[in-house]
């Protein structure tokens, strides 16, 4: 499972012209689910993402996680994160989990974020989404379990 996390001042996701998820300060989490991923990996990745210290403290040092910084999260499924890009001119997606399993684990990950007490907004699995964000930094990290 892969999470591309971006520290944002704001972010939103729109489907069919309607905003379905929106946050101010926090993390935009683009989530890719691979074959072999399970609840244990999703739980571990959620713990890492929510605990990752990428927000500035009073001295400006990256020392606070999203909860400590009073931020929110917007979780958006993105199967292209699991693409095989090693060869050729076209990405391959054979490493991606079957859509039904990917959706289940995406929903599980979202549930884990909410159980941790972080306000969590979402995109819509398998939809054509328009994601808007204002990067803060920019600060972007790739986390993988």
UniProtKB/Swiss-Prot annotation:
One cellular component term from this protein's GO annotations in UniProt: cytoplasm
Keyword Signal among UniProt keywords: no
Signal peptide (from-to): none
Entry superkingdom: Bacteria
Motif extent (Gly-cisPro motif, important for rejection of L-amino acids): 137-138
UniProt KW Nucleotide-binding keyword: no
A molecular function GO annotation: Gly-tRNA(Ala) deacylase activity
GO annotation, biological process: D-amino acid catabolic process
Primary enzyme class: hydrolase
Enzymatic reactions: glycyl-tRNA(Ala) + H2O = tRNA(Ala) + glycine + H(+); a D-aminoacyl-tRNA + H2O = a tRNA + a D-alpha-amino acid + H(+)
Domain characteristics, as noted in the entry: A Gly-cisPro motif from one monomer fits into the active site of the other monomer to allow specific chiral rejection of L-amino acids.
Family annotation (NCBIfam families): D-aminoacyl-tRNA deacylase
HAMAP family listed in its UniProt record: Deacylase_Dtd
Cited function: An aminoacyl-tRNA editing enzyme that deacylates mischarged D-aminoacyl-tRNAs. Also deacylates mischarged glycyl-tRNA(Ala), protecting cells against glycine mischarging by AlaRS. Acts via tRNA-based rather than protein-based catalysis; rejects L-amino acids rather than detecting D-amino acids in the active site. By recycling D-aminoacyl-tRNA to D-amino acids and free tRNA molecules, this enzyme counteracts the toxicity associated with the formation of D-aminoacyl-tRNA entities in vivo and helps enforce protein L-homochirality.
Family membership: Belongs to the DTD family.
PANTHER family (UniProt xref): D-AMINOACYL-TRNA DEACYLASE 1, D-TYROSYL-TRNA TYR DEACYLASE
The protein's name: D-aminoacyl-tRNA deacylase
Species this chain originates from: Pectobacterium carotovorum subsp. carotovorum (strain PC1)
Encoding gene, per UniProt annotation: dtd
């Amino acid at each position: 499972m892969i999470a591309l996390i971006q520290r944002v001042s704001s972010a939103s996701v729109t489907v069919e012209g309607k905003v379905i998820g929106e946050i101010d300060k926090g993390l935009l989490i683009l989530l890719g689910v691979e074959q072999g991923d399970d609840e244990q990996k999703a739980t571990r990745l959620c713990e890492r993402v929510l605990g990752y210290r990428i927000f500035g403290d009073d001295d400006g040092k990256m020392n606070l996680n999203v909860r400590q910084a009073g931020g929110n999260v917007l979780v958006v499924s993105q199967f292209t994160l699991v693409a095989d890009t090693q060869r050729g001119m076209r990405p391959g997606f054979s490493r991606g989990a079957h859509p039904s399993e990917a959706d289940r684990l995406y929903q599980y990950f979202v549930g884990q974020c909410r159980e941790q007490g972080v306000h969590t907004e979402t995109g819509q699995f398998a939809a054509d989404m328009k994601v808007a964000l204002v990067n803060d930094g920019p600060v972007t990290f790739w986390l993988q379990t």
